[in-house]
UniProtKB/Swiss-Prot annotation:
The gene coding this protein: hb
Modification sites for Phosphoserine: 209, 228, 230-231, 584, 587
Top-level lineage group: Eukaryota
Record protein name field: Protein hunchback
Phosphothreonine found at: 199
UniProt entry tagged with the keyword DNA-binding: yes
Native organism: Drosophila virilis (Fruit fly)
Function: Gap class segmentation protein that controls development of head structures.
Alphabetical list of PANTHER family matching this protein: GROWTH FACTOR INDEPENDENT 1 TRANSCRIPTIONAL REPRESSOR (PTHR24390:SF159), ZINC FINGER PROTEIN (PTHR24390)
PROSITE patterns: ZINC_FINGER_C2H2_1, ZINC_FINGER_C2H2_2
Gene Ontology cellular component terms for the protein in this record: nucleus
Record's keyword annotation contains Metal-binding: yes
Ranges annotated as biased composition (Acidic residues): 567-578
UniProt-listed Gene3D superfamilies: Classic Zinc Finger
């Protein structure tokens, strides 16, 4: 500071102002702006000396003249050029990165201006670089996430992620002496130049703090996923070890969703297991509380505590036989085994939802208000005795109570037609929605008739054939072809299932299975010998030709009928077409007409003793009481009139045809599923014994005792989706035949001896050539035959070598 007391005033104000301006320009603009930190003391000293000199001797030296503006501008431009040259030098760049001022380039001995502060900053930067490289090297060895150095964003008080690297190595750097400044600073500059490329700039954000280990977080998530479909026995346990971190902190699954623990008594939701256990204790009686000795777990059930203690001890005695999965109880193992199965036991009746777990199925039904479909067993067979209690607390499906089965059978026989039709119409939506569950356990009752077509290419068109009313020509053609057909490839399982009315198998034969049925028939035909396939193809061609011939003959005969017959025919055909269309729309499944029935002995004797057409026409006339009492629609009550007209047409055509055709005509008049004779006999049988399941279709399986009888069972799948069974029996061993109505899915069979009514039923497995006297044993045996390969076990999927290999496999291996 100048001494204002000793200094004298300027000669004039203008001279003093000019002197002050020149002094300000000389002292400020000649010094770099970035160097004011380190040269502040020097500038202050210079200003002080200049002030003192100017103040002490104003008279000895005259005041400097004002510097022209042009001279000041030139000096300012020169200083700017010097600053640009200084920034290009590595020395200045290193100092700028370390946030230290660059020395002035005007002096040649600029290194002398570096003091101990600059040297200390350079050494600290080198040490930071060494620690950074060491951290990266250790990170690569332990396979951790990318760890960074010091994070300036870390709040104070929190542990530094790099503290274990800096804690032991951070020492106060020695202060270099000013005497060794040239040598030490030169070495530091060379080292800084080499490390400049690897040193991160100070304005770049360091790496973030290390995240939590993925391995530690993945284990509880995996355990939580495994417990998602387990039973209620493990509802209090979700992790392998109930340590403090798992029971006192919220748990997140792999999708980032926090797990909640909901009380089933009051609905309170907790986010930690400790809070959930504390709340659960309030609902328990004090004398029944069981508490774990290692954690706050509480329960009222002894087996729950036992499972929990096994988790603490890491004891998992139950192990899967197909993988390395282990668990603490049998319920968890049963839930896990479903993951290895391809059978979806629970299906929705209102949508395509299917699942393996009953709990998930109940949640779906509650959420959308849907109705459950048919429950399947573990092997895929439909089990109508199991029902789903949607809003109940019972685990798994429950069985129906059969206490009132006798009264229900007696009431069924007395039910009126309207009530029966209404009951079946209510069951139709459930029946039509069952998709692809039928063929998981039972093979389809297909046959080697014309619908099989010998190959997949010809079977598929037959499966989608248009619906057409039954005509006499087609019936005659099928009857003529029946004696030459080979025996059935698959047993008539439909008639077997109809014996037990509790096995609601027919709802599965609907439009959804048409393509699958054609593929199943093609797969069966592919296993036959080439000679058998050629024979079937030839028979199909012959049948097609005969059908065309019969249609031509039918057209010629209709033109020769009298006028009154034509009028009656038109009226009856219109009624039949209306009824047939109404049935195809209203009734997707007619089970009442599919019951196999027995012919009365009197009717059999009349058909044998009356060869003439007039007597046969008289015996086939209908009465009012011959119509079926149980039907699904009004169409089946008028089927008798149509049959009478068809019978008259067949008899007239037989009178004009050759004697060979006359011999074949009586077989075509046999009662079928749509005939009133079959319906009347079915009603009589139901009235006599409504709860019995015996039928002539079961007795028609006696192919082993009567080898000379040809049995044909044809199955066709059409777009109508109707399902019916047709069976006929006669005492003539050479005239046994079956008629499959076109446009329906039918399975028919015929018996062949006069003593068939008293003989027991015998069931034959065509694959293994074995006969069964019990329907249950036969059903169990057929459940082991797979759909795609008959000698592959349907339970476990193992392929066997022929029937012997399959039986050995069934005997040696346990199937659950």
């Amino acid at each position: 500071m100048p001494n204002w007391e000793t200094s004298t005033a300027a000669p004039s104000y203008e001279q003093h102002n000019a002197w002050y301006s020149s002094m300000f320009a000389a002292n400020i603009k000649q010094e770099p702006l970035s160097h004011h930190h380190h040269h502040h003391g020097q500038q202050h000293h210079d200003n002080h000396s200049n002030s003192n000199s100017g103040a002490s001797s104003p008279r000895q030296s005259p005041l400097p003249s004002p510097i022209p503006p042009s001279t000041q501008l030139e000096q300012y431009l020169k200083q700017q050029q010097q600053q640009q040259q200084q920034q290009q030098q590595p020395m200045d760049t290193l100092c700028a990165a370390a946030m230290t001022p660059s020395p002035s380039n005007n002096d040649q001995n600029s290194l002398q201006h570096f003091d101990a502060t600059l040297q200390q900053q350079l050494l600290q930067q080198q040490q930071y670089q060494q620690h950074f490289q060491a951290a990266q090297h250790q990170q690569q060895q332990h396979h951790h996430l990318a760890l960074g150095g010091f994070n300036p964003l870390t709040p104070p008080g929190l542990p530094n992620p790099m503290q274990h690297y800096y804690g032991g190595n951070m020492r106060p750097s020695p202060q270099p002496t000013p005497t060794a400044a040239p040598t030490a600073v030169a070495a530091a500059i060379q080292t800084g130049d080499k490390l400049q490329a690897l040193t991160p700039p100070m304005d770049v954000t360091p790496p973030k703090s290390p995240a939590k280990s993925q391995q530690s977080s993945a284990e509880p998530e995996k355990e939580h996923d495994l417990m998602s479909n387990s039973s209620e026995d493990m509802k209090y346990m979700a992790e392998s070890e109930d340590d403090d971190s798992n029971i006192r902190m919220p748990i997140y699954n792999s999708h980032g969703k926090m797990k909640n623990y909901k009380c089933k008594t009051c609905g309170v939701v907790a986010i930690t297991k400790v809070d959930f256990w504390a709340h659960t204790r309030t609902h328990m009686k004090p004398d029944k509380i069981l508490q774990c000795a290692k954690c706050p777990f509480v329960t009222e059930f002894k087996h729950h505590l036992e499972y929990h203690i096994r988790k603490h001890k890491n004891q998992k005695p139950f192990q899967c036989d197909k993988c390395s999965y282990t668990c603490v109880n049998k319920s968890m193992l049963n839930s896990h085994r479903k993951s290895h199965s391809s059978v979806y036991q629970y299906r929705c009746a209102d949508c395509d939802y299917a699942t393996k777990y009953c709990h998930s199925f109940k949640l779906h039904l509650r959420k959308y208000g849907h109705k459950p479909g048919m429950v399947l067993d573990e092997d895929g067979t439909p089990n109508p005795s199991l029902v789903i209690d949607v809003y109940g607390t019972r685990r798994g499906p429950k069985s129906k109570s059969f206490s009132g089965s006798g009264s229900s059978c007696s009431s069924t026989s007395k039910r009126s037609n309207a009530s029966a039709a209404a009951a079946q119409q209510q069951q139709q939506p459930v029946a039509t929605s069952q998709l692809s569950a039928a063929l998981q356990g039972f093979p389809m009752p297909a046959a080697a008739a014309g619908t099989a077509a010998g190959a997949a290419g010809t079977a598929a068109p037959a499966a989608v054939a248009p619906v057409s009313p039954p005509s006499p020509a087609k019936s005659v053609a099928s009857v003529e072809q029946a004696p030459s057909l080979p025996s059935a490839l698959l047993p008539p399982l439909a008639s077997l299932l109809q014996q037990n009315r509790n096995m609601a198998f027919f709802p599965y034969w609907n439009l959804n299975l048409q393509v699958l049925a054609a593929q199943q028939q093609a797969a069966v035909l592919a296993q036959l010998s080439p000679r058998m396939r050629d024979q079937l193809q030839q028979q199909q061609q012959q049948q097609h030709q005969q059908q065309q011939q019969q249609q031509q003959q039918q057209q010629q005969q209709q033109q020769q009928l009298p006028a009154h017959s034509e009028n009656e025919e038109d009226e009856e055909e219109e009624e039949h077409e209306d009824d047939f269309e109404r049935k195809s729309v209203d009734s997707a499944m007619d089970l009442s007409q599919g019951t196999p029935v027995k012919e009365e002995p009197q009717q059999q004797q009349q058909q044998q003793q009356l060869p003439h057409s007039n007597h046969m026409a008289i015996n086939l006339k209908l009465k009012d009481e011959d119509t079926p009492l149980i039907s699904s629609s009004s169409a089946s009550r008028r089927k008798g009139r149509v049959l009478k007209l068809d019978t008259l047409l067949q008899l007239k055509s037989a009178a004009m045809s050759s004697p060979e055709q006359q011999l074949k005509l009586p077989a075509s008049v046999l009662p079928t599923a749509s005939s009133p004779i079959a319906g009347s006999s079915a009603n009589k049988q139901l009235a006599d014994d409504p709860c019995s399941g015996a039928s002539s279709a079961d007795e028609s399986m006696e192919t082993g005792r009567v080898p000379q009888v040809n049995i044909s069972a044809s199955s066709t799948a059409s777009s109508s989706g109707n399902s019916s069974n047709a069976s006929s029996s006669t005492s003539n061993p050479t005239a046994a035949a079956t008629v499959a109505t076109s446009g329906t899915v039918s399975s028919s069979s015929s018996s062949s001896t006069t003593t068939s009514s008293s003989a027991p039923a015998i069931y034959e497995c065509k694959y293994c050539d074995i006969y069964f006297k019990d329907a249950v044993l036969y059903t169990i045996h057929m459940g082991y035959h797979s759909c795609d390969d008959v000698f592959k076990c349907n339970m476990c999927g193992e392929k066997c070598d022929g029937p012997v290999g399959l039986f050995v496999h069934m005997a040696r291996n346990a199937h659950s």
